[in-house]
């Protein structure tokens, strides 16, 4: 298994965060996407072990960066639906964080919109994560069937707009929908991240909406860890030469 640095969230031409992804490296060096191997972990009951592995690896890498004096920013980790049902997940993740003596602001937790459907316990779990110092992100918003009312019940810190919503840009009705979704989120005090941004047109429209962060192939594809570190080291220099954000 190979931990991969994800697409970057970028605000004002600076990297302000990242998302940790996992890829399975085969013997020939090629990679399997999560869609091919995650179902296997879910089927054999090992998905929570995988989630914990990713969380621990991100903590370890963040500790390395901190000791090296590098600029720190939050890295988000996905939590599967199955892991949410483990009663000790908050204590377990808090304990791992303490092992690496990290500030909780450098590790964020992503929960997919689909995981919140028909799950009355999620709201309580989010509050427990907050008490432990974690920021909790609602991932893939707009891709599932959860009610807008859930945003009032479940106190997420960040709303990540699914790529399917971003692809509406260029369509009048779609842009109107995006406008009111972002206004609602901002009124509720949520930070907003637009996912799957691929074109200059999308970047320009999203900035008109005063969206906080942008994530997508327009800035960078998901990068292996070493390439991500190199990208970060050159990012400041590159941003001085050419602004990535209009």
Language-model-derived ranges and their functions:
Residues 6-38, 58:
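A short, well-structured catalytic beta-strand-centered motif of the EAL phosphodiesterase domain
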Residues 14-19, 46-122, 196:
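Catalytic core of bacterial c-di-GMP phosphodiesterases, primarily the EAL and HD-GYP domains
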Residues 20, 36, 40-41, 54-62, ...:
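Structural preference for long, well-ordered alpha-helical segments in enzyme cores
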Residues 27, 64-71, 99-103, 131, ...:
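Nucleotide second-messenger and two-component phosphorelay signaling modules
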Residues 94-169, 184, 188-222:
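The catalytic core of metal-dependent phosphodiesterases that act on cyclic dinucleotides
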């Amino acid at each position: 298994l190979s931990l991969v640095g994800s697409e970057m969230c970028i605000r004002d031409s600076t990297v302000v965060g990242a998302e940790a992804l996992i890829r399975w490296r085969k013997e020939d060096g090629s990679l399997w996407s999560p869609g091919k191997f995650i179902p296997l972990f879910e089927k054999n009951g090992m998905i929570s072990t995988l989630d914990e592995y990713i969380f621990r690896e991100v903590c370890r890498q963040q500790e390395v960066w901190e000791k090296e004096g590098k600029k720190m920013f939050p890295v988000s980790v996905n939590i599967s639906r199955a892991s949410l049902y483990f009663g000790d997940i908050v204590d377990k993740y808090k304990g791992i964080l303490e092992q690496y003596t990290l500030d909780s602001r450098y590790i964020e937790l992503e929960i997919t919109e689909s995981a919140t459907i028909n799950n009355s316990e999620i709201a309580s779990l989010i509050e427990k994560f907050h008490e432990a110092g974690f920021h909790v992100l609602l991932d893939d918003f707009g891709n599932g069937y959860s009610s807008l009312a859930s945003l009032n019940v479940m106190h997420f810190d960040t709303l990540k707009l699914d790529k399917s919503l971003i692809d509406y840009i260029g369509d009048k009705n779609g842009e109107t929908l995006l406008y009111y979704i972002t206004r609602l989120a901002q009124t509720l005090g949520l930070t907003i991240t637009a996912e799957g941004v691929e074109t200059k047109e999308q970047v320009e429209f999203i900035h008109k909406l005063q969206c906080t962060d942008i994530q997508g192939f327009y800035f960078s594809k998901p990068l292996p860890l070493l390439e991500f570190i190199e990208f970060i080291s050159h990012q400041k220099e590159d941003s001085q030469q050419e602004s990535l954000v209009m």
